[in-house]
From Swiss-Prot:
Residues 8-68 form the HTH tetR-type domain. It comes from Burkholderia lata (strain ATCC 17760 / DSM 23089 / LMG 22485 / NCIMB 9086 / R18194 / 383). InterPro entries: BetI_C, DNA-bd_HTH_TetR-type_CS, Homeodomain-like_sf, HTH-type_TetR-like_transc_reg, HTH_TetR, Tet_transcr_reg_TetR-rel_C_sf, Tscrpt_rep_BetI. Keywords: DNA-binding, Repressor, Transcription, Transcription regulation. Repressor involved in the biosynthesis of the osmoprotectant glycine betaine. It represses transcription of the choline transporter BetT and the genes of BetAB involved in the synthesis of glycine betaine. It comes from the Bacteria. Pathway: Amine and polyamine biosynthesis; betaine biosynthesis via choline pathway [regulation]. One of its GO terms (molecular function) is DNA-binding transcription factor activity. NCBIfam families: betaine_BetI, PRK00767.1. The keyword Glycosyltransferase does not apply. Pfam families: TetR_C_6, TetR_N. The gene is betI. Residues 31-50 bind DNA. This is HTH-type transcriptional regulator BetI.
Length: 194
């Protein structure tokens, strides 16, 4: 009889091992066997929980996305209710510690690349993109006309992605302070009359 709660503990252990494997060996070097080795369990157990490598990557990305959505929700709730503060909170969530560790950043890069070839990952990417745009648009719409709010949301989303991507590819720890400053300056520019 399986231990109560063991399924979630084991899944978390395997997702952590997947993040470490992608960090150390990249997506091509990440296999069910490499994940099993890092988690000190059999390959059969990895297969039991996730089926195959695609299932493992999907579960890992769902975990990373949940962390992002949790950080976004937490920061928006904690922020003052004005659009500028809430927009800054959304930006900060994208540069949250849960999103900028080397294993997570490399997993994001692998996910983006693989999402162009895998329908389930593509769907996850579209959900994430729409959620970010919707959150940004909702806040900009409190201060700007609808069309401008949509354009501002698209611009800020592109800036977030660009700053994040440059940081991820820089080869060292991401300079979140510099990224946040640039994004805040952009928000301030758009809301200058606010």
């Amino acid at each position: 009889m399986p231990k109560v709660g063991m399924r979630e503990i084991r899944r978390a252990q395997l997702i952590d091992a997947t993040l470490r494997s992608i960090d150390e060996a990249g997506l091509p070097g990440t296999t069910l066997a490499s994940v099993a080795q890092r988690a000190n369990i059999s390959t059969g157990i990895v297969s039991h929980y996730f089926g195959d490598k695609d299932g493992l990557l999907e579960a890992t990305m769902r975990h990373v996305l949940r962390d992002l959505w949790s950080a976004t929700t937490h920061r928006r709730v904690a922020a003052r209710k004005d659009p500028r503060s809430r927009l800054r909170a959304i930006v900060a969530a994208n540069f949250d510690d849960t999103q900028v560790s080397a294993p997570v950043m490399k997993t994001w890069l692998a996910f983006w690349s693989q999402s162009m070839h895998d329908p389930m990952l593509k769907r996850l990417q579209h959900v994430n993109t729409r959620r970010l745009h919707s959150n940004l648009c909702a806040e900009f719409a409190k201060a700007l006309p609808r069309t401008q709010a949509r354009e501002a949301a698209s611009g800020l989303a592109a800036l977030i992605d660009g700053l994040w991507l440059r940081g991820a590819l820089a080869g060292g720890p991401i300079d979140t302070r510099a990224a946040l400053k640039l994004a805040h300056d952009y928000i301030d520019l758009l809301l200058a009359s606010d």
